[in-house]
Amino acid sequence: SIACNQQQRVDISPLNLLVYPMMPMVRSRVLDLLHFSQLPAGQNAMVAVMSYSGYDIEDAVVLNKASIDRGYGRVVISKKQVFSLKKYPNGTQDIIKAPPRREEQKGMDDATWERLFEHYKPLGEDGIVEVGVYVKVRTDWVHSYVHGDILVNKEIPVNTGDFIGDNCTYIVIDIMFSNTAAPVKYKENGGYVDKVLITTTDNEYFLIKAMVRDMRVPELGDKFSSRHGQKGVVGLITGQENMPFTNAGIYPDMIMNPHGFPSRMTVGKMMELLAGKAGLYDGERKFGTIFGGTNVEDCAEILVQHGFSYCGKDVMYSGTYDKNGLC
């Protein structure tokens, strides 16, 4: 989250927004100053710190596919598409034309019309892409060509530098000031047009900005990070039936390797894990500042009162093999 009006802004690209932001279970002085409770920028995950497979070495993490299907780590990415209509010294300028219509091509069958002009469908009557339509890059495997949907049906002058002389005929003038098609095509991943802004620049050029919104889910190679900067890439996304589980039937959202703690020396993250688990059962957000925060012994006592280990460890059962281990 960057501001309260980020849904109305078109000056930031790409704009990454978490779909389900959550208030952190463990807070600190810096988070209170930044008002992360009102503008959260993360999700609370059920993390199992254990060495479970070879897919979590070198700071890699293992994700639960069922958690991803429930919305864990889902983001909305908005990218800006900018187009301009220029004016040239000889008085010519770029123009926008209306998209071709079906009734204008009477001798063309429907299949040919769809193949040749389907990428003009997102355009409105003014030749500019409409809000709410889906744009993408279309692939025609039969005729072996790839083209993106048209965002602006723009035409540019053929001649942009020569002026008209006194001895020019009407035919020469018509040739010199004719336009050629230069439609602006979409070249990114498919998405929905969120908003369209038409404005002008300092040079009196027309400027058209379109924000295209796309939904993304975590995939292999994506980087995750905790609030302590303990980051790692996704090494494996597996089904919930393959994940370890506790005797209470709790499956983790993520598995991270414990060998990353000694090398990174992130002792505060160990305290955050213990305080977060204690706050989950105590119903109180803990203070995770390493100096002067919530006492670690108090968090351990809370865990003991709720039937857990003093050190925060749990016995988990493998979903793949007939084994159990500590987490």
Where do the PLM segments sit?
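Conduit-forming functional cores of very large proteins
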Residues: 1-327
